[in-house]
């Protein structure tokens, strides 16, 4: 038995000495006794590479690099100690999930916390800690019982927590018993098997890279001391600690304590002990400033280094993004200008996760190959999401969200279909399911999905060929999804035991060819050079299969409910991690200060050197709090270090990082976080500035304009990055600011490079004004043809904003349809219901004015019942909530029909047309226009209601439009082309009255009828008839009426003097109109309708001439942008030059009419000329 201690500060050559010694032994005797190099997990690949890259290693037949875990696996395989089933942390977490559910009633503390996310993982880590520190369930129980009666509340609380941990620990051990081995028991078994391991006898063991050992690891080392020929152990310490432990505040407290522990163990074993002290700093022979920093770190008082300090750079950055971009630029400069290889450079953070996403994004932008050390979670891999979402589909009764989470993993796509085509078809199915509210048995009842692009409440249209083709495609895609998931659901429903449930999931994965699809994805990633991604695809299937195997091995014959099975599977999947090794040798290594191990690093960037980050504040994420640990320590239980001890050890981790690079050390910190909150630099920055006052300083910025030309040149990283910065600089130049000549050189290069078309296209953004140019004539013709057929509302849309019209009617863009009841649906229902009631009355030869209240109830309910199944894919029949809405809509319709009946009783007008169509198959012809540019335009549509009345002067016609919100007619909106419907309908019916009704007619007015169920507020209680009277007033129709007393009295035959309760008109005692009456002369109606015609003609010409301007109006506080669906496309922004509203002025009706008359006269004169 022999042990040699190698002691020395960082950079003194301990690891190099071990490697050289191993290489020498291999050279002298390639087939001699085994050489085992024992290092931490993070260091195995690095040391294997260092040994393998030398020719003297002879292929490493004799020497092997192991971590403790890999050594255990190797020895147990040789000695037969691996005959029991090993359970990984993933399997333990699944087991603990089951145990927690079973033992929840026994908990004193964990009852509420046990259902929180991450709880199982914390418990598993605590169990692992008990194992590593050789704590048995009996010991935990003993401490808990003894402290349960303590007079101190804190101790009793801690004892209750320990009670719950003992329950879980005991139950876990009972489940494992003699058949299984906890992964943390590897080292205990290893210690037991070392005496019979031939590989250890005569072997030379080298131990390096460890800062401390757990009791389990010390048990293994003890057996190695007893049975190996020699052990050599290297520690980063400033002196030998063979006879004393270091002071608590000593920089080398952690490693010195470990040195002392191992030395005492070696003495107890009776080993021959020798020590070699490495005193010279070999790493920094040519960088005396870094050597001084290494030697003087944490020495008090500070002795400043007065010499030049070219190898230490402290960089300040405005943000984390600016910091990482600055690091990327410096890395490229080191490679291009200083001749370093990427493998010579490392980036280190205290917590890599804080920077991981930014590092990935920036380094990919800058084309810097990198490897991030650490085990990344598998939870975002598509296979993990497939399993989770498929179980959620079953749990949630085939809800849309779960189904399409499953679909978007792309594992349900057939192998023979290209991914792009499959994605497009899956997206179309998703849109269909959202629009039709597909869920539950609609997926599984065997019926086909039916597709109709347009659906009317009044008529049934034949399904078009395009709709038939779309329907077939949707059902084909459905067949990718439903059969495998439905089979999984049936198998899980019939499963009796865990074994059957796991088998159901496995068969599901096999049926959809997951292994083949993963292999295909792996090969595609390899071919594209995405090696890390390829490795992930290779590992994830094995990890899932291992998880299933462990589940079956441990609990295969037990019966579980589906919810608990899903919880356990979910827990297991959440714990899976990728074990990646660097896919390439020449790449930047990115790691954390505490876990990563590096060797022969020339340049190191320590990022995120901010207050609270370096040194790190101890996190209290464990089940056991700091107080709990202190209490356990007093009770004689040895566990992992307390927060106070970890805080003391932070200085050693910082020291290790500072002393790692041989050529150059970069420290950087951010001045603000992502939200703009200010951040302070770490005390380490101030300390280094005091110790090394002549250090180099740098500023990492996102805008290079403040830097010297040579510094700005670093921003020219590659074409992609350079283009971005060039555009930014040229924008400054356009704003009359000077820029460096560097950017003109870059610009000239970009304009002549092979990718110049891309650069030119992006450069065009410099002259972006957010103005839409008119369409070319050939494009306009392709979009619209020579003949436009449209609606009045389409023309109103164009007059509101030409670009919005272009987006909806030119590009035919549409909002995604959702399965929900919206205002247009309700409006459509009311229109159709009122038509249905009117048609029924005609069939039954009844009149509105003869209806009783009971009739209104009957007809309204019947109309809603008939139309509800046809509205928005049967949405009113889909749920109890919508059934309630249907009842509310019936109530409103009953109220409205009752009011219409009351109106009819006092009116001389009666309906002559309901939902009256013009154009197409309608009884009225379309409005047609011959445009100046040779195109033609016709307007088609439907009129809600046309009423007629016989007067002494002939036939009167009026238009009534049903509205779900209160509406009046603003002549300013008519003038600007924003409200054209009612006057168009009136013009149309009057123009074609003879062809339609066989007699010329006179316009009587245009009125809006508000469909609603008003709520009456009164200062005093009202009688029922008074309430009805107030409600009746709320239905007064607004609009414009003919300035004719006879016509007005025909609308309200009760009107003699005073104000009408039916229309917006009133009469004085002398029979003339009151001033607040909304009346116009027949000439004025004619002037308005002629203006509307001219407005249509002008709009048609502008559309066919290709006008697509982004020109929304603003009238008072109204703008079309408020409810526009295309804001993200036009990107209208008042802060951009030339993006201004067309401000329209609102004027009194008589002023508007006078203006229209004047313009009409000018138009007539122009036509005459």
Curated annotation (Swiss-Prot):
UvrD-like helicase C-terminal domain: residues covered: 280-586
PROSITE patterns: UVRD_HELICASE_ATP_BIND (PS51198), UVRD_HELICASE_CTER (PS51217)
Family affiliation: Belongs to the helicase family. AddB/RexB type 1 subfamily.
Further comment found in the protein's record: Despite having conserved helicase domains, this subunit does not have helicase activity.
HAMAP family, sorted: AddB_type1
Function, as annotated: The heterodimer acts as both an ATP-dependent DNA helicase and an ATP-dependent, dual-direction single-stranded exonuclease. Recognizes the chi site generating a DNA molecule suitable for the initiation of homologous recombination. The AddB subunit has 5' -> 3' nuclease activity but not helicase activity.
Protein name according to UniProt: ATP-dependent helicase/deoxyribonuclease subunit B
